[in-house]
């Protein structure tokens, strides 16, 4: 049996149950474990309570319980520069970004990893539901978490081979109820703490109010694809392709009671396009273009791949053909797909393995670009 005590693992601890159990398992396996709390956002709420302070107290309590040293590190500047500025720029461009993908790439597995190495880390570990397996030649492959409902490889798809080489995901082989049970059996103070929801820097806040603090809203016309005026929208940034709620038009226009959906945006004219029916023609596409395409293992500069893909988190896989050229890709769908959204991640899979992914730039319907931005 190998002696893990000489291997230092620095754990990103958020104050939640997943990262608490991650630290616990590594400690039980004999590793030299250090807990780190990352403060990425100044999130004082309207009552003057900073939730990060409460979360850090939970980290301290758990670290003391399991007997590991802990530190707090401030990445607010890195987060603002590398994640939040990107988030705002994407909304300005009419797209719908996924900040969690960028946060993992730039903060949790870059800024945090760099910091952990200064502490002598051999590995970093997080509470993500994913798995890493190492080939005999040392190549690391990332697999989906065993808990299909919690699998987070979609958000980890931009990680590089170098980052994965230094990473452990101790929860990848567990289901969420098992993690809670382990926390309860160990008497961890976070055992019953509810999972955090929403974008990390918004949390439970009203998204519209939050965004309007940083980007001025520009109301404009809401129209059908064939030019019927449907009233006013509150600002293109508040709507995403395929969205149903928040349009304020219901079944009031015409006799058809089918629900209304956002089917497109014209950024230059500040028009929001809407249409009736979940599978409205304007929501369906047959291919997409992606940039910032990246694979977790070394791949040729140009190649074609038959695999499956996800276009949003918790979506079933769809069969695709991917034509890759440098960091760009054309992704052709075996079956038409609904509400492909510029700014979101497209992530590629071969069975259990997450191969990598990219960011969606445009959707196409039979060769014609969809008017999504």
From Swiss-Prot:
The keyword Cell membrane does not apply. Disulfide bonds join 103-200. Its EC number is 2.8.1.13. The active site is at residues 103, 200. Transmembrane segments: none annotated. Residues 98-100 are annotated as: Interaction with target base in tRNA. ATP binds at residues 12-19, 38, 127. Catalyzes the 2-thiolation of uridine at the wobble position (U34) of tRNA, leading to the formation of s(2)U34. NCBIfam families: PRK00143.1 (NF001138), trmU (TIGR00420). HAMAP family: tRNA_thiouridyl_MnmA. This is tRNA-specific 2-thiouridylase MnmA. It comes from Streptococcus pneumoniae (strain JJA). The gene is mnmA.
